[in-house]
Curated annotation (Swiss-Prot):
NADP(+) binds at T554, S607, R608, G613, G614, Y615, V616, Q617. NADPH-dependent reductase which is a central component of the cytosolic iron-sulfur (Fe-S) protein assembly (CIA) machinery. Transfers electrons from NADPH via its FAD and FMN prosthetic groups to the [2Fe-2S] cluster of DRE2, another key component of the CIA machinery. In turn, this reduced cluster provides electrons for assembly of cytosolic iron-sulfur cluster proteins. Positively controls H(2)O(2)-induced cell death. GO terms for molecular function: flavin adenine dinucleotide binding; FMN binding; NADP binding; NADPH-hemoprotein reductase activity; oxidoreductase activity. PROSITE patterns: FAD_FR, FLAVODOXIN_LIKE. Pfam families: FAD_binding_1 (PF00667), Flavodoxin_1 (PF00258), NAD_binding_1 (PF00175). The lineage of its organism: Eukaryota, Fungi, Dikarya, Ascomycota, Saccharomycotina. GO terms for cellular component: cytosol; mitochondrion. This is NADPH-dependent diflavin oxidoreductase 1. It comes from Yarrowia lipolytica (strain CLIB 122 / E 150). It is found in: Cytoplasm; Mitochondrion. InterPro entries: CysJ-like_FAD-binding, FAD-bd_FR_type, Flavdoxin-like, Flavodoxin/NO_synth, Flavoprot_Pyr_Nucl_cyt_Rdtase, Flavoprotein-like_sf, FNR_nucleotide-bd, NADPH_Cyt_P450_Rdtase_alpha. FMN binds at residues 88-93, 136-139, 174-183, 209. Its EC number is 1.18.1.-.
Length: 688
């Protein structure tokens, strides 16, 4: 075991947002993962509720092989092949899958790392012999969007019980035990693979965001155990050894510059962004700050018009900017432009926005690495890692860095397992290598990168002898992920309306950090072109239910959409909270209008105002009779949306307390009632 821990490099403190993925309604709003919030987590089994995998029938869909695949490893032995499929929403499961792929390459396997949705049923049924699935759980037991396609196939009733009898498998899950269905997704997948005849190699691994130990430590330990089991099941031939961890593996996605071709101009980043193939196009029609000018938190009411025939980015026919500035009721904008929409949105739907690195940051990296002279030649990349929305064209080094490489994120330890090979200074090489080691190296890395929020670009420029071979660019730098936002407009209207908090803060080393997406978005002008993708993830139909909504901060965005769209005589209650009534009462005009129209019962909490009543959970307790009446007597729905951490846990504790005290129940009885709400889908929770 210790040999395998040393052989296969560990990984660093990972973005904890993976554990806070949204609940079964998929109301995504992960505004910025760069700079990344990273916390300690570990393996902790807390859920005892049995898992029942229910199969379903349906029409067969077309399944195609992924366009971008990991190339065959020259170090693999004939017939020694492993497929590692991941499902993720913030990238953590993908990072683990990539690390596991590298580890298996060192065991002389031909390793293929793919999204679950890119693993076709034909390939799974015929070509896969060893399978590992790495999957996070989205909120209350759901599988992420990029894994649902394969999961739906696996649930078909007509599948024979021996479909996967040729497959040896294991799984690894990422979860958060503060959710009632902790690691539910991976447990469902694991059980279903067994039902279809697959046999286990090694045990399933799980990590828990709520544990004091790091998920990286737990993952490393599980990986070592799995690799040990894998070697026992598939021993190496005599005379063939495992590839040492100190040896640099060949590039999986090699890149070279076509200097024999003309240079390409990709300086117009907005135009280049629109060359992605798998996106929708729109025009910015609103980018209004909705918090007070003197307030430290800049929140934007951001609007995108996609009202064009064939979505061809035609010029606007109205002066949306003037309409927005003249209207205190932001819903007026939606009503004014709803006719003729070519793209339809329902309450709960989300959009992905694609950030761009700044010109200054891109130029700095090009200068530091000596790539300026080759930055504008077209790239030759025989294989590309999969990416949502597709790649821009032409793909030059400049456009690749601008639109696709995450150079401003906090580096993970996997980054250092590559780059120490490329430093020419022995002292710098030794230091970089230390960051790639478990134990003290992990602690040093946390102090160096995570605590001060140091970016990849800063690391590269600080180690001046570090020169990354162009061939390894796609292996060394992580890909930028799109950021997901819930719509806030009334269903079936345009423009798309988003509520976005601009990320900007000072670190402990007195450096200003800005979110890549929100810095870019904050500077977009009216009329500017933008690309996005749409995710149809509507919440359940709540018109037949009384609803209590709890929404601090920008969590109010999907609540606004629900309130504007709701056509029901049922009771609608909102507990909204923020810091200051006069500075960040988001959507105040809309909410107060709904109150005046008898469509909403509104309770507010402003934590920094004197005598404001504190936080949303404190106001809920003051209204405990209402809470108990709606949730118990009227069998209503509770819908919680906002930042992760204390808020969702304290809201749940408050709900249990309200029900207990008003009904005269024991704590155990109230807890069982809330668990029943969670199981029946009447307790909806999204945090990030």
């Amino acid at each position: 075991m210790s040999f395998l821990l040393n052989l296969i490099p560990a990984i660093s403190h990972t973005n904890h947002d993976e554990m806070h993925e949204p609940n079964q309604t998929h109301l995504h709003r992960h505004a910025d993962t760069s700079p990344t919030n990273q916390h300690n987590t570990s393996h902790k089994m807390t859920t005892t509720e049995p898992i029942h995998v229910t199969t379903g029938s349906g029409e067969s869909r077309d399944h195609t092989e992924p366009r971008h695949v990991t190339p065959t490893s020259p170090n693999a032995l004939d017939g020694r092949r492993i497929t590692i499929a991941y499902a993720t929403e913030t990238g953590n499961a993908q990072d683990f899958a990539t690390l596991l792929g590298n580890a298996c390459t060192r065991l002389r396997f031909e390793s293929h790392v793919v999204q679950m949705n890119d693993l076709s049923p034909e390939t799974l049924a015929q070509d896969v012999s060893v399978l590992v699935i790495v999957c996070s759980t989205t909120g209350q037991g759901e599988i992420p969007l990029n894994g649902k396609k394969l999961w739906k196939f696996l649930l078909r009733k007509k599948l024979p019980p021996n479909l996967l009898s040729h497959v040896t498998f294991t799984t690894f899950g990422l979860g958060d035990s503060s959710y009632p269905r902790f690691n539910w997704a991976i447990r469902k997948i694991h059980k279903r693979l067994s039902q279809l005849g697959a046999s286990e190699v090694g045990s399933r691994g799980e990590c828990d965001d709520m544990s004091p130990d790091s998920i990286e430590t737990m993952y490393n330990e599980w990986q070592a155990r799995f690799c040990e089991s894998l070697l026992k099941a598939f021993p190496l031939p005599e005379g063939v050894e495992v590839i040492p961890g100190e040896k640099l593996l060949p590039a999986k996605f090699p890149v070279k510059v076509l200097t024999n071709k003309p240079k390409r101009d990709t300086s117009d980043a907005d135009h280049v962004a629109c060359t992605r193939k798998d996106v929708l196009q729109g025009t910015v029609v609103g980018n209004e700050r909705v918090t007070a000018k003197g307030h430290f938190q800049d929140v934007r009411f951001f609007q995108i018009d996609a009202n064009t025939e064939d979505n061809d980015m035609a010029d606007l026919s109205r002066d949306f900017s003037k309409l927005n500035s003249d209207s205190r009721d932001l819903h007026d904008v939606s009503r004014a432009v709803s006719a003729g929409s070519s793209i339809d949105f329902s309450t709960g739907d989300t959009v992905s926005l694609f950030p761009q690195n700044s010109v200054a940051d891109v130029d700095l990296l090009l200068r530091d690495q000596g790539w300026e002279d080759i930055a504008d030649y077209k790239l030759d990349a025989p294989s590309l890692p999969p990416i949502e929305g597709g790649y821009v064209t032409p793909l030059t080094l400049r456009s690749l860095i601008t639109h696709h490489l995450d150079i401003m994120g906090i580096p993970r330890q996997s980054f250092f397992t590559y780059v120490f090979h490329f430093a020419t200074s022995e002292r710098q090489k030794e230091r970089l290598q230390e960051f790639s080691q478990p134990g003290e190296g992990l602690e040093d890395l946390f102090d160096y990168a995570n605590r001060p929020r140091r970016s990849i670009l800063e690391v590269v420029t600080e180690f001046d002898s570090l020169k990354i071979p162009l061939k390894y660019v796609l292996d060394v730098f992580p890909l930028m992920r799109p950021r997901l936002f819930s719509i806030s407009q009334k269903a079936h209207t345009m423009p798309i309306q988003l509520c976005v908090a601009i990320v900007k803060y000072q670190t402990i080393i007195k450096r200003i950090r800005e979110g890549v997406l929100t810095r870019w978005l904050g500077g977009l002008a009216i009329g500017q072109k933008i690309v996005f993708t749409k995710h149809s993830t509507p919440i359940p139909d709540l018109d037949n239910y009384d609803v209590i909504m709890v929404a601090p901060g920008t969590g109010v965005a999907p609540m606004r959409s629900l309130i504007l769209s709701r056509e029901s005589e049922k009771e609608t209650v909102l507990f909204f909270g923020n810091r200051f009534r006069e500075k960040d009462f988001l959507f105040q005009a809309d909410l107060e209008k709904a109150v005046g129209d008898k469509k909403l019962n509104l309770f507010t909490s402003f934590s920094r105002d004197e005598n404001s009543g504190g936080y949303v959970q404190q106001e809920m307790y003051r209204q405990k009779e209402l809470v108990a009446r709606v949730l118990c007597s009227k069998q209503g729905v509770l819908y919680v949306c906002g930042s992760s951490g204390k808020m969702p846990r304290e809201v749940r504790i408050t709900v249990v307390t309200c029900i207990q005290e008003v009904n005269g129940w024991t704590e155990e009885q109230a807890e069982e009632w809330v668990k029943g709400m969670e199981k029946s889908g009447r307790y909806l929770q999204e945090t990030w």
